[in-house]
Amino acid sequence: MATVAEQWVLVEMVQALYEAPAYHLILEGILILWIIRLLFSKTYKLQERSDLTLKEKEELIEEWQPEPLVPPVSKDHPALNYNIVSGPPSHNIVVNGKECINFASFNFLGLLDNPRLKAAALASLKKYGVGTCGPRGFYGTFDVHLDLEDRLAKFMKTEEAIIYSYGFATIASAIPAYSKRGDIVFVDKAACFAIQKGLQASRSDIKVFNHNDMDDLERLLKEQEIEDQKNPRKARVTRRFIIVEGLYMNTGTVCPLPELVKLKYKYKARIFLEESLSFGVLGEHGRGVTEHFGISIDDIDLISANMENSLASIGGFCCGRSFVIDHQRLSGQGYCFSASLPPLLAAAAIEALNIMEENPGIFAVLKEKCKRIHKALQGIPGLKVVGESISPALHLQLEETTGCRERDVKLLQEIVTQCMDRGIALTQARYLEKEEKYLPPPSIRVVVTVEQTEEDLEKAASTISEVAQTVLL
């Protein structure tokens, strides 16, 4: 039966071939030949080429003009006119061979040149050596690292802490460890560059609210709430984060934490608090903006800070609940893929914590000096003070811009240079202008430390005022 059926099909095919129109057969034949040609032909043609003559080669070489390896840079660019520091940048700093009072370094508690920190670091150096030569997960965890994490957790009154070997990488690693693609982040417009890099790495949906404007933040939260109601299934798996600084690097202002906590619970969001400037500065015991406002540490989901300011060491830390911190040990890129903090720096940070706990009055002294310099800098012709009176890092901006950022920078740099000639070391706030999301105006940064005397503060204010009148008027 099968053979008969096959013969019948063959007969039908031959009959259909005879009955088909001629143009149909021609078209099918052309297509079959084209397919055969494609199967057996090469995917490319060898182009016929003729070698250039010696004369033609010489002409091409003569005409060729190489592009510059780097873009042209003016001779007065800051990168080509750097200052050379000799010795530790403590209360007095030697810049380009000239001794000045240091109003530029974030040595808020004056611990950078402290003998106790030096002794602790030296003892650790003799015991452990210089570095660890490995990340925390690969034989880079020393007992001093665990001691420091335990001390930080107890000092901040949290369940657990984790340390990073580089301050900038701390918040830049913590953000993408939790916030992923599809999550929503509400961030302050004045957020520092480290937060910006963390947001970029997270690939989350970023919503920016005006600086310290809680009405604008609530507007964005309400808009998101309306969007969530349209798609409840998606809303259930979408996480919402509010990321702010305790004391803003770019403005010297304190975040309104009580209002932020209210919005957190009202709209079911998580708060990440970056406290690199406020840790060791604000609060009765230097615990930061939570202690400053009397807010429970449990109301904040994650706190991050570097140890390069008040603790006069290197690296950074995050603290919070244990399940939050443990997640970073496998997901924090700066923790997993960087060599761990050198033990000598961890030992120095522990000793700095000891000093902070032994002498809590140091924070009141710093606060009082911040208020004095803030008041003394008011009313300088041509300059305005940006920042709160309790901030140890203030900004001096031009009252009226020239309309050109480059000219503004040059004017402020001239003030910095002349102040340095008179024994006051200042610095401009520097930014990667092409990478900043919202570029702050040019400014001179004035940093207050506990080591500065009343005479130092008065001298700095009077020097800045005199130089500003000379340069700007």
UniProtKB/Swiss-Prot annotation:
Pfam family, one: Aminotran_1_2
Molecular function per GO: pyridoxal phosphate binding; serine C-palmitoyltransferase activity
Principal location class: endoplasmic reticulum
Pathway: Lipid metabolism; sphingolipid metabolism
Cofactor(s) recorded in Swiss-Prot or TrEMBL: pyridoxal 5'-phosphate
PTM field: Phosphorylation at Tyr-164 inhibits activity and promotes cell survival.
Cytoplasmic side: 37-473
Enzyme class, broadest EC rank: transferase
Keyword Transmembrane helix (UniProt): yes
Record topological domains on the Lumenal side: 1-15
GO cellular component: endoplasmic reticulum; endoplasmic reticulum membrane; serine palmitoyltransferase complex
Subcellular location: Endoplasmic reticulum membrane
InterPro entries named among the record's database cross-references: Aminotransferase_I/II_large, AON_synthase_class-II, PyrdxlP-dep_Trfase, PyrdxlP-dep_Trfase_major, PyrdxlP-dep_Trfase_small
Domain notes: The transmembrane domain is involved in the interaction with ORMDL3.
Function: Component of the serine palmitoyltransferase multisubunit enzyme (SPT) that catalyzes the initial and rate-limiting step in sphingolipid biosynthesis by condensing L-serine and activated acyl-CoA (most commonly palmitoyl-CoA) to form long-chain bases. The SPT complex is also composed of SPTLC2 or SPTLC3 and SPTSSA or SPTSSB. Within this complex, the heterodimer with SPTLC2 or SPTLC3 forms the catalytic core. The composition of the serine palmitoyltransferase (SPT) complex determines the substrate preference.
Family as reported in the entry's similarity comment: Belongs to the class-II pyridoxal-phosphate-dependent aminotransferase family.
Protein name: Serine palmitoyltransferase 1
Origin species: Bos taurus (Bovine)
